[in-house]
Amino acid sequence: NNTCMLLCTSFIMLTRISMDKAVRQFIIMVVAAVITMIIPYVIDRTWQLAKIPWVYGLIGLALLLVVCVIGNTSFGAQLSISIGGFSFQPSEFVKISFVFFVATMFYRSTEFKNVAITTGVAAAHVLILVLSKDLGSALIFFLAYVLMLFIATSNWLYLAGGLGSGCAAAMLAYKLFSHVRVRVEAWQDPWSDIAGKGYQVTQALFAIGTGGWFGMGLYQGMPKKIPVVEKDFIFAAISEELGGIYALCILLICLGCFMQFMLIATRMQALFYKLIAFGLGIEYVVQVFLTIGGVTKFIPSTGVTLPLVSYGGSSILSTFILFGVIQGLYVLKRNEEEEEEQ
């Protein structure tokens, strides 16, 4: 039900913004739905998933390196690659393989040597994303790894060290990358350059304020004034035309999905499956936070999409796969409980 509500909202807004994009999104959604129906059966019947950590790790690094070297540049960041006229964003799919890699490594061992090796590979993922200037994805990967490490080891020193290194890396990124400074400055005082670097943020705030609690109604607002509104700023369009109450409902639905992920994670007995559910849940909620936080000026804009709502084939396909994996873990746990009862 939650997924259907988010998808319906997406199609309503995309139809409003661009019918062509809405049709493309629908076609990709159908393909994603078919793939998602297969995933739970694969997870329930395939025990080899926990035996190939380096397949997950090396494939993920290879895809990110390809984007870093020959990827298409969008708003200062290298995000996608084009093959046969189609463009896709590998980092959306590497988020899933990354969680599988970390879960598999920590399932094997949580001794310091293995933690150090896993941390090195995880850091390589994050570093490549930083070099590609895809800082939103880098932050998602980083937080997912630190929290998965803590769940696997229950070591508070790892958690403190990870968060501390993250803060230091954020300050370093601010000094090294000009587009990071632009985003931070636009967040701090967008009104000082309302026609330049603060334009996107201020237009989003205008849209949210204009919509009020109940919205202006479909086709009554001006969401197209916001650059790339169909992607990382679609929450502003929802607030403007459907209202703040509706937008809050979308936020609560996203939080409800996250809580379901966490409930499934706590019920899984095997550490491998527990870490997968937890890691995917963290990635999902961090992405929601970055998107909505950036639109509402709570944090600097990071350029990530709102899962299942924003336009983007890679985004919707990877999110469907993520939900399919979680559903597979739920089916696995249910089957285990039925076997115990018998």
Regions found by a protein language model. Name each.
Residues 97, 233, 315:
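Active-site phosphate/pyrophosphate-handling residues
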Residues 290-342:
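A juxtamembrane structural motif centered on a specific transmembrane helix
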Residues 134-139, 214-218, 229-231, 248, ...:
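Transmembrane helix boundary and interhelical junction motifs in multipass membrane proteins
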Residues 85-92, 131-133, 212, 216, ...:
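Glycine/serine-rich anion-binding loops at beta->alpha junctions
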Residues 190-231, 235, 244-246:
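TM-adjacent membrane-interface loops and short helices in multi-pass inner/ER membrane proteins
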